[in-house]
């Protein structure tokens, strides 16, 4: 892989080469011997998982590579890629996992650029470096950090603006958190969001192009994000069993529908990118409306300031609205179902 290919975004050459590779693969498939339709592959399927903290399943302990720089990815040993892989094996579908390079904090461009780890812990190579010519399946989520969802949450919460909580800055620290719904709905935040979504769309296109170039035979599966805020936001006015904080802490209730609209827009952008790029999409948003952060005992999302399973220097780290064990299992089932569907085509 050349450094130019790693670092150039929106590269037309990647798209042209991808199209050529796909066309060649189609011709070879047509010329090859007929196989049995709908049969799962007999051989292990070389697979690469990629993504951010929602693929790594930040918040679930223990984490992998705890004693190395990759420990700062907070990738759970039992993340949804691991659980989905086992579930498929129980059905006779074996994934040969070449790598799981999912890492908390990853932006879309970290697929082709190095990722700086927090606290000066080092840097990781581009996630695309895990791809091989024989990779047959790629699965993962990227987009939330590029959109700046942590900054959006900070814009809406005085608690999250405290220095010890959630890295990053609010979109506009001069605007009060209490008015964040107005800020994103009709204020300066509206244009900021439009610009962010334009970037997300372009970079998701680049991501899928790159997978097609570096792993030309790979099925590409883009996984959306589970729904955080329910349709009925009055549920968010009650703390979950055993909790004292509300699921979204001090975020105003009138801002919660705005946050949900932003997440729905991200989901739609990811779905469109997958469709336009000829990839498959796992619509977790559509399938998790009964398991949001505000669904009490049924919640699949840990509350914003609810203690997760992780500790840092003896202090519990909050979930920051990431999937808990239940949510991880929902992710794993829907991803495994999609992989089974794809491999049985």
From Swiss-Prot:
One of its GO terms (cellular component) is extracellular region. Its main location: secreted. GO terms for molecular function: carboxylic ester hydrolase activity. InterPro entries: SEST-like, SGNH_hydro, SGNH_hydro_sf. Pfam families: Lipase_GDSL_2. The gene is estA. It is found in: Secreted. Its EC number is 3.1.1.-. Induction: By zinc. CDD domains: SEST_like. This is Esterase.
């Amino acid at each position: 892989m050349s450094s130019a290919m790693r670092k150039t975004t929106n590269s037309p050459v990647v798209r042209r080469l991808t199209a050529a590779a796909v066309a060649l693969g189609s011709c070879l498939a047509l010329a090859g011997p007929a196989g049995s339709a709908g049969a799962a592959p007999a051989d292990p399927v070389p697979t690469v998982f990629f993504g951010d903290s929602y693929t790594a399943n930040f918040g679930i302990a223990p984490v992998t590579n705890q004693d190395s720089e990759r420990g700062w990815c907070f990738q759970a040993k039992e993340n949804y890629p691991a659980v989905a892989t086992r579930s498929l094996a129980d059905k006779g579908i074996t994934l040969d996992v070449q790598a799981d390079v999912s890492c908390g904090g990853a932006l879309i461009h970290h697929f082709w650029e190095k990722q700086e780890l927090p606290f000066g812990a080092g840097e990781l190579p581009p996630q695309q470096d895990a791809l091989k010519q024989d990779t047959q399946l790629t699965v993962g989520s990227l987009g939330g950090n590029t959109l700046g969802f942590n900054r959006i949450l900070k814009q809406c919460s005085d608690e999250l603006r405290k220095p010890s909580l959630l890295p990053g800055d609010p979109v506009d620290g001069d605007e009060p958190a209490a008015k964040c719904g107005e800020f994103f709905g009709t204020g300066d935040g509206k244009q900021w969001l439009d610009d962010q979504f334009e970037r997300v769309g372009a970079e998701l296109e680049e991501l899928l192009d790159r997978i097609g170039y570096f792993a030309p035979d790979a099925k590409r599966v883009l996984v959306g994000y589970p729904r955080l805020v329910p349709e009925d936001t009055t549920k968010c006015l009650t703390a979950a069993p055993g909790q004292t904080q509300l699921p979204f802490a001090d975020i105003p209730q009138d801002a919660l529908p705005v946050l949900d609209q932003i997440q729905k827009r991200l989901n739609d952008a990811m779905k469109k990118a997958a469709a336009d790029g000829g990839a498959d999409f796992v619509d977790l948003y559509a399938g998790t409306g009964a398991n949001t952060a505000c669904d009490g005992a049924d919640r699949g999302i840990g509350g914003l300031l609810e203690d997760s399973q992780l500790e840092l220097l003896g202090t519990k780290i909050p979930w920051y609205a990431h999937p808990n064990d239940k949510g991880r299992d929902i992710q794993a089932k829907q991803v495994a179902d999609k992989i089974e569907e794809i491999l049985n085509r």
